């Protein structure tokens, strides 16, 4: 691959673009038809492509990976450990969703729903962008993650099972509501979206939401229209966001190493997956899989 040499430490994006369409030329490989497995049954993407396909090694659960000529790679800066480099995907998503999709910037007020990898990454992105107020919501079982959100720069955290989240947001904003809502809840149903719509300012608020498998009957379009809310979707990241994530990790400005809560060897990959899925009671926030052990 052009620009790489043996011994380079690299981060490989999961997109495998064609490199000549309008999206690839703009560094938006996520939108390339060649790598979109949803619409292209022959699409290639690391972590999604079966080992039955040519190249075989299309994932990270191995000691080697197959890199075709069109693999999208980034050099990892010196001083960024393998565990930190493993945070590039959630952090680049956080940068993409908060700054580009959500338009978070100087003096903006932000509500982030869900203190997982993506939510905490958006705390960092919003803080770095100059947001004047960052509120993070979660549940009682998220107590340690809400504390981490505070340590990363959130101005207030709310346990939605113990407090009236909307009332708290309005209290913190003098009754105005926030400029931006970033919904990072997964499998929480429609309640977070409804809360986000109510918590936004009356005019020109922005809500960024994810939920590829979610359905929303009776969506409150009338309320969105009345409040002039812009709804944006969260999906993946651009090349530029990955570069910014690597720069952020190299700066060591935030204690991002605290997101890398667990580490396992290749022989424990099944346990690692179950731990991340919440099946083992370990509260794994982000897991590092080390195919070569501690080498």
Annotate each language-model stretch with its function.
Residues 1-25, 29-30, 77-79:
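Glycine-rich beta-strand-centered segment in the early N-terminal region that forms part
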Residues 25-44:
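Iron-sulfur (Fe-S) cluster-binding segments and ferredoxin-like electron-carrier domains
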Residues 63, 71-72, 77-163:
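Mid-domain Rossmann-like dinucleotide-binding core that forms the NAD(H)/NADP(H) cofactor-binding site
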Residues 101-106, 128-129, 135, 143-147, ...:
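Glycine-rich cofactor phosphate-binding loops and adjacent beta1-alpha1 units
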Residues 162-164, 171, 175-176, 191-198, ...:
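C-terminal hydrophobic helical "lid"/dimerization subdomain
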Residues 205-208, 219-259:
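Rossmann-fold dehydrogenase core element
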């Amino acid at each position: 691959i052009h620009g790489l040499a043996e011994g380079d430490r690299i981060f490989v994006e999961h997109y495998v673009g064609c490199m000549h369409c309008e999206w690839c030329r703009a560094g938006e490989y996520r939108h390339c038809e060649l790598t979109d497995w949803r619409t292209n049954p022959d699409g290639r993407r690391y972590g999604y492509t079966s080992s039955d396909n040519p190249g075989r090694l299309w994932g990270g659960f191995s000691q080697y990976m197959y890199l075709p000529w069109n693999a999208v790679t980034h050099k990892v800066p010196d001083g960024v450990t393998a565990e930190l480099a493993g945070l590039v995907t959630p952090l680049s998503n956080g940068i993409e969703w908060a700054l580009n999709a959500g338009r978070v910037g100087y003096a903006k007020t932000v509500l982030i729903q869900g203190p997982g990898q993506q939510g905490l990454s958006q705390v960092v992105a919003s803080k770095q962008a100059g947001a004047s107020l960052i509120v993070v919501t979660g549940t009682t079982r998220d107590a340690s993650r809400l504390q981490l959100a505070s340590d990363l720069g959130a101005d207030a955290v709310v346990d939605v099972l113990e407090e009236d989240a909307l009332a708290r947001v309005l209290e913190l904003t003098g009754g105005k509501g926030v400029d931006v809502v970033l919904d990072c809840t997964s499998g929480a149903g429609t309640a977070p979206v409804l809360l986000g719509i109510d918590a936004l300012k009356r005019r020109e608020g922005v809500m960024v939401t994810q939920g590829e498998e979610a359905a929303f009957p009776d969506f409150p379009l009338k309320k969105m229209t009345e409040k002039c809310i812009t709804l944006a979707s969260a999906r993946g990241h651009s090349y530029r966001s990955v570069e910014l994530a690597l720069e952020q990790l190299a700066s060591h400005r935030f204690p991002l190493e605290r997101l890398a809560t667990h580490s396992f060897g290749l022989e424990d990959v099944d346990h690692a997956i179950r731990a991340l899925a919440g099946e083992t009671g370990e509260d794994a926030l982000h897991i590092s899989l080390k195919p070569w052990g501690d080498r």
